[in-house]
Amino acid sequence: MEKKAVIITGGSSGMGKAMAKKQAELGWHVMVTGRNHEALEETKKEIQTFEGQVACFQMDVRSDSAASDMIKEAVKAFGRLDALINNAAGNFICPAEKLTPNGWKAVIEIVLNGTFFCSQAAARHWIDQKQQGVILNMAATYAWGAGAGVVHSAAAKAGVLSLTRTLAVEWGSKYGIRTNAIAPGPIERTGGAEKLFESEKAMARTMNSVPLGRLGTPEEIAALAAFLLSDEASYINGDCITMDGGQWLNPYPF
């Protein structure tokens, strides 16, 4: 049986790396992409379980041409493409009144534009091949709630959520392409956690906001992602699954 193949953008660290590792353990071919070539190669060495299983592609998701090249390279490496995980992201804490135009544009371009460019490139391939693929996007609970200090990311993630639902309807009905999203809460060993926990006060606030009283792990996100990519989830489309320990039920976003 031919092994399935997935592309994971931002796949060399945090949740992206965990998802890449999980799919590799399940026997999938995996392409990890990002801007740091050395980090990509290191990830490849760590997660590969057989020769030729993992490929690296250095790119910037803000480029639509790079997104197209990414798809071509994955198909060249594996002979097929079955799924795309749009994990590349950019974020930083900044009061809205102090946010610069460049800071705003950078996050919007990476998170929203990048997600669309990569999704479009993958869908064009599947449509041409008359294949039913799967897209998984990374959202955030503040996409429908609120998050002081992350207006740029909140706006971008809200766009990703709307994009997810719209493409699920449009491409799902026309081509059988499934599109879903995951909205993670505070996850340990990620860039987001490092930014949030710059002080003990910030850490305490976050921990108190999660009913389960702990952070999530990249491995838990990876397990959910693996399910959503699997045939067992073939009737899930246009949904956003929250994995935040119940934090969204509390009054504080982080």
UniProtKB/Swiss-Prot annotation:
Record key words, sorted: Fatty acid metabolism, Lipid degradation, Lipid metabolism, NAD, NADP, Oxidoreductase
Catalytic machinery residues: 142 (proton acceptor)
Annotated metabolic or biological route of this protein: Lipid metabolism; fatty acid beta-oxidation
Reaction(s) catalysed by this chain's protein: a 4,5-saturated-(2E)-enoyl-CoA + NADP(+) = a (2E,4E)-dienoyl-CoA + NADPH + H(+); a (2E,4Z)-dienoyl-CoA + NADPH + H(+) = a 4,5-saturated-(2E)-enoyl-CoA + NADP(+)
Ligand binding (NAD(+)): 157
Residue positions binding substrate: 100
Induction trigger: Repressed by FadR in the absence of LCFAs (fatty acids of 14-20 carbon atoms). When LCFAs are present in the medium, they are converted to long-chain acyl-CoAs, which antagonize FadR as to its binding to fadR boxes on target DNA and thus derepress transcription.
Keyword DNA damage: no
Main EC class the enzyme belongs to: oxidoreductase
UniProt signal peptide: none
Its EC number(s): 1.3.1.34
UniProt-listed InterPro entries: DECR2-like, NAD(P)-bd_dom_sf, SDR_fam
GO biological process: fatty acid beta-oxidation; fatty acid metabolic process
Gene Ontology terms for molecular function: 2,4-dienoyl-CoA reductase (NADPH) activity; oxidoreductase activity, acting on the CH-CH group of donors, NAD or NADP as acceptor
Cystine crosslinks: none
Record's function text: Auxiliary enzyme of beta-oxidation. It participates in the metabolism of unsaturated fatty enoyl-CoA esters having double bonds in both even- and odd-numbered positions. Catalyzes the NADP-dependent reduction of 2,4-dienoyl-CoA to yield trans-3-enoyl-CoA.
Protein family (similarity comment): Belongs to the short-chain dehydrogenases/reductases (SDR) family. 2,4-dienoyl-CoA reductase subfamily.
Name of the protein: Probable 2,4-dienoyl-CoA reductase [(2E)-enoyl-CoA-producing]
UniProt source species: Bacillus subtilis (strain 168)
